[in-house]
Swiss-Prot record:
It comes from Cereibacter sphaeroides (strain ATCC 17029 / ATH 2.4.9). Involved in the regulation of the intracellular balance of NAD and NADP, and is a key enzyme in the biosynthesis of NADP. Catalyzes specifically the phosphorylation on 2'-hydroxyl of the adenosine moiety of NAD to yield NADP. GO terms for molecular function: ATP binding; metal ion binding; NAD binding; NAD+ kinase activity. Belongs to the NAD kinase family. The gene is nadK. Its EC number is 2.7.1.23. This is NAD kinase. NAD(+) binds at D44, G45, N114, E115, D144, A152, T155, A156, Y157, N158, Y159, S160, A179.
Length: 254
């Protein structure tokens, strides 16, 4: 079925705002809750923001690249948008759920589509204890940080930290160390998608750590739990032959 009601959103970048004016004038602007499809104009950062802000609507989101990074975006063109939406392939993503506890006892819940990362927040290296499904797997990881990512997020920060690119259909998560000092050669692990990963910060006052879920940070954490959230799903639309699986393969040969 060809979507008739389209809701457009755009980043604050001038090129994205210009595209918003052009596309809304040409195809009409529908309130997002009433739309058949949402079109996000910007880069990957804005796409993540849009997915977070619209996750309760269960409406597919089609990105058009008007930013600097476009891994999650389709090419921008003013013509034939309804036809492209009708022919698009849909990918369903389940995000990560993060529960972070601070030294003051505050509890923060965040959703992350790409990754949850723990990063040292001072000059001292972070000391982390890692547990998986209630069993301690590493008593002490000395590092700049660590992250857990989804397959969709494996080409982002995870890949920059020398983590593996995961097939989009794989029921696994990547746990990747960021600049590990001890164990020096330990890079991380592949875990089942159902795993509950827990990080406990050792000597948190001397070695402060922050947790970050897709750019939303919590400072001075003492523990962080991460798991897949099956109750939340994000629907992404891609042009035929340019879905996430193809993009993940292509990224490895750049």
């Amino acid at each position: 079925m060809t979507p008739q009601r389209i809701g457009f959103v755009a980043s604050s970048a001038p090129v994205a705002q210009e595209a918003l004016n052009v596309m809304a004038a040409r195809y009409g602007q529908c309130p997002l809750p009433e739309a058949d499809a949402i079109v996000a104009l910007g880069g990957d950062g804005f796409m993540l923001q849009t997915l977070h802000e619209t996750q309760s609507l269960d409406i597919p989101v089609y990105g058009m690249n008007r930013g600097t990074v476009g891994f999650l975006m389709n090419g921008y063109a003013e013509d034939g948008l309804r036809e492209r939406l009708a022919e698009a392939e849909e990918e369903i993503l389940n995000p990560l759920a993060m529960t972070a506890v601070t030294g003051a006892g505050e509890v923060f819940h965040r959703i992350a589509i790409n990754e949850v990362s723990l990063l040292r927040a001072g000059p001292q290296a972070a000391w982390l204890k890692i547990s998986v499904d209630g069993k301690v797997r590493m008593e002490e990881l000395v590092c700049d940080g660590a992250l857990v990512c989804t397959p969709a997020g494996s080409t982002a920060y995870n890949y920059s930290a020398h983590g593996p690119i995961l097939p989009i259909g794989a029921d696994v998560l990547a746990l990747t160390a960021i600049a590990p000092f001890r164990p020096r050669r330990w890079r991380g692990a592949l875990l089942p998608k159902t795993a509950l990963v827990r990080f406990d910060v050792i000597d948190a006052q001397k070695r402060p750590v922050m947790a970050d879920a897709d750019g939303r940070s919590v400072r001075d954490v003492v523990s962080v739990e991460i798991r897949t959230e099956p109750a939340v799903r994000h629907r992404l639309l891609f042009d035929p032959g340019h879905g996430l699986e193809e993009r993940l393969i292509r990224e490895q040969f750049v």
